[in-house]
């Protein structure tokens, strides 16, 4: 992958939940990236050029457009703008693609993708890639959310599982009303019985959540398990 600076125009913004949006950006020039990559986004705010890193959530076969899935940080400089102002048509600067935890490094035929919150966006891109890998034997996708309203890309992941008996999807929610049939708690509460031997494990989300999950997986002493951890604050 060649890292470069380029420009983009925000073409559309979709509300995924009260705290998450998907931003589609038309690029000034095509880029090649591996799923799992991120870009740095630069935006002029006042007299300051603000930079933030966002993972790419779109498939890698579209080189002219990318989507970024962003989470509202109420006290942040950049994301509140997308909730308070119509940013469609805004021209931005980007740099990338960047990242170490990318699909070209995941060589095994059994893959686990775990996502907390907005980390579901990059897992969507990675899942799209592996759904097209013929030698894949098993792809397990588990996402974790605070509430049912914050589950992201539900229909997309359901469609993957419906179209392949090699793919399974589970959603775990920490805060649920009584009587809900959705698995309750955290992802690490629902991995008993999974075989992590000879597998690639990708985790994306807030750093503590990622570390807690990896600790639980490592406690099972799997052999030949590779870890790809994308933690953020």
What are these regions (language model features)?
Residues 10-13, 56:
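Conserved hydrophobic positions within beta-strands
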Residues 102, 122-125, 152, 212-213:
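Phosphate- and divalent-cation-binding pockets in alpha/beta enzyme and binding domains
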Residues 36, 119, 206:
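Short, conserved phosphate/pyrophosphate- and ester-handling motifs at nucleotide-, phospho-/glycolipid
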Residues 21-112, 147, 175, 232-233:
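FAD-binding FR-type
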């Amino acid at each position: 992958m060649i890292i470069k600076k380029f420009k983009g125009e925000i073409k559309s913004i979709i509300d995924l939940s009260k705290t998450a949006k998907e931003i589609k950006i038309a690029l000034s020039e095509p880029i090649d990236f591996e799923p799992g990559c991120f870009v740095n986004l630069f935006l002029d705010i006042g007299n300051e050029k603000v930079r933030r890193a966002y993972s790419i959530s779109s498939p890698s076969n579209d080189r002219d457009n990318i989507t970024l899935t962003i989470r509202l940080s109420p006290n942040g400089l950049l994301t509140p703008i997308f909730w308070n102002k119509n940013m469609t048509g805004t021209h931005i600067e980007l740099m990338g693609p960047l990242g170490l935890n990318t699909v070209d490094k995941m060589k095994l035929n059994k893959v686990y993708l775990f996502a907390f919150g907005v980390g579901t966006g990059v897992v969507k891109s990675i899942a799209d890639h592996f759904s097209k890998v013929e030698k894949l034997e098993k792809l397990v996708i588990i996402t974790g959310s605070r509430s049912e309203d914050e589950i992201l890309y539900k229909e997309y992941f359901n469609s993957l599982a419906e179209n392949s008996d090699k793919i399974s999807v589970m959603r775990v929610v920490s805060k649920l009303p009584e009587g809900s049939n959705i698995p309750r708690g955290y992802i690490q509460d629902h991995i008993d019985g999974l075989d992590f031997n000879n597998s690639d494990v990708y985790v994306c989300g807030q750093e503590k959540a990622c570390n807690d999950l990896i600790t639980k997986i490592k406690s099972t002493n799997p052999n030949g398990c590779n870890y790809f951890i994308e933690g953020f604050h």
